[in-house]
Design a protein with these regions (language model features):
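Extreme N-terminal starter segment of soluble prokaryotic enzymes
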Residues: 16-19
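Intrinsically disordered, tyrosine-centered linear signaling motifs in cytosolic regions
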Residues: 77-78, 216
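PLP-dependent class I/II
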Residues: 4-14, 24, 28-46, 54-70, ...
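Conserved N-terminal alpha-helix of the aminotransferase class I/II PLP-enzyme fold
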Residues: 78-111
Length: 397
């Protein structure tokens, strides 16, 4: 019988002479959960997905129409390596409207999703002696990107007493002459928490490059998201269209960077990626110009789901110390039920047929927690939580 708790090393044996940094990378566990869930579905099992951070909405109609029109207009060739100038102007205008900051369109690199932006920044900033400060827990892939750039991840615990927020003093203590950058993410994955103005001002003053992942901006239900560019122009901003506009499959993101870095970033972009999809870029222009009402509609639906899920999880015995303010995740304390979030997540999948993400996927600081995604219909969320509740009852909780 297949052991779903295996490390998957047998499946992923590599050649003898491979990069040791790659061997240090951990699996993206949520993808392992999804892979097993898909296997169960192929066997006829009805699985409810509360694990994957992907909007369940279709792209806005204006986005689909723009993509189709781009094909009809034969806009299927390479664009400028930094991205279509019209799209970069729209991104700059968006940052002016949203945050009151002036962004030079020539300081924007359009990428195939925001993940290439992470790679571009780290390849620019890092060498084998570099250190990059990350939160623990934090987005699972940051650490592996740092390893891919031959650098060392330095993990700073989030403070449970402070609502799973970054502690600026803990960061300050980790800054050394080798620090190449500090990753911040707001709203945060997996916690959904916003970084406040005081923190952003403080971290911007440390004299270290800040890499600010702002991909969940636009999906904020309480408070206001601030861009790091409101406090410094020496930062690197990662953003994109996947979450806000539900455009995950179109793979469109962007990087905003200091002007002094642009030529180096352009060389990296030219050599590694050439350019982002011309079709997706046309769709991005339409999204920024016309999709605000679609985003507002999606946000209202997410918020309804968020409120329901928070209430229901608490009834079930999960502890939610601080309610998430944005994104579409709830990071719930499951230590009443388990000390092994990996095993717990797969047990829930196998027995309740609901996919959830183990907290250990986000670092050792996430152990004992599980992440629930409310990027699914309210009907599916209700059914999924019913199944988990029944499973926990069978286990004696």
């Amino acid at each position: 019988e297949k052991n779903y708790l295996c490390s998957l090393t047998d499946k992923r044996k590599t050649m003898k002479h491979t990069n040791p940094q790659v061997e240090q990378m951990t699996s993206f566990i949520v993808m392992d959960v999804l892979e097993r869930a898909n296997e169960l579905q192929k066997q006829g099992v009805d699985v409810i997905h509360l694990e994957v951070g992907e909007p369940d909405f279709d792209v806005p109609a204006c986005v689909a129409e723009a993509a189709k029109a781009a094909y009809d207009r034969h806009l299927t060739h390479y664009t400028h390596s930094l991205g279509d100038p019209e799209l970069r102007r729209e991104i700059a205008a968006f940052y002016q409207r949203e945050y009151g900051v002036t962004v030079d369109p020539d300081c924007i690199v359009v990428t195939s999703g925001s993940s290439p932006s992470i790679l571009l920044v780290l390849m620019l900033l890092c060498n084998s002696d570099s250190e990059v400060i990350l939160s623990n827990p934090g987005y699972a892939c940051y650490r592996n990107f740092v390893l891919a750039a031959q650098a060392k991840p330095v993990l700073v615990p989030l403070s449970e007493e402070n609502g799973l927020q970054y502690d600026i003093e803990a960061i300050r203590k980790c800054v050394t002459p080798h620090t190449a950058g500090i990753f911040i993410n707001s709203p945060m994955n997996p916690t959904g928490m916003l970084l406040d103005e005081s923190f952003l001002k403080s971290v911007a003053s440390l004299g270290v490059p800040i890499i600010s992942d702002e991909i969940y901006h636009g999906l904020v239900y309480e408070g206001r998201a601030h861009s790091i560019l409101e406090y410094t122009d020496k930062a690197f901003v990662l953003n994109g269209f996947s979450k806000r506009f539900a455009m995950t499959g179109l793979r469109l993101g962007y990087l905003i960077a200091p002007k002094s870095c642009m030529r180096s970033l352009q060389k990296l972009q030219q050599n590694l990626f050439i350019c982002a999809s011309s079709i997706a870029q046309q769709a991005g222009i339409a999204a920024l110009r016309q999709a605000d009402s679609d985003v507002e509609r999606m946000k209202q639906i997410y918020d309804e789901r968020r409120r329901y899920m928070i209430s229901r999880l608490r009834e079930m015995g999960f502890e939610i110390k601080v309610e998430p303010q944005g994104a579409f995740y709830i990071f719930a304390d499951a230590r009443k039920f388990t000390t092994d979030s990996y095993r717990f997540a797969f047990d829930v999948l196998e027995n309740a047929h609901v996919g959830i993400t183990p907290g250990i996927d986000f670092g050792t600081g996430g152990e004992g927690y599980v992440r629930f995604s409310y990027a699914n219909s309210l009907e599916s969320i209700r059914e999924g939580l019913d199944r988990i509740s029944q499973y926990l009852s069978r286990c004696g909780f």
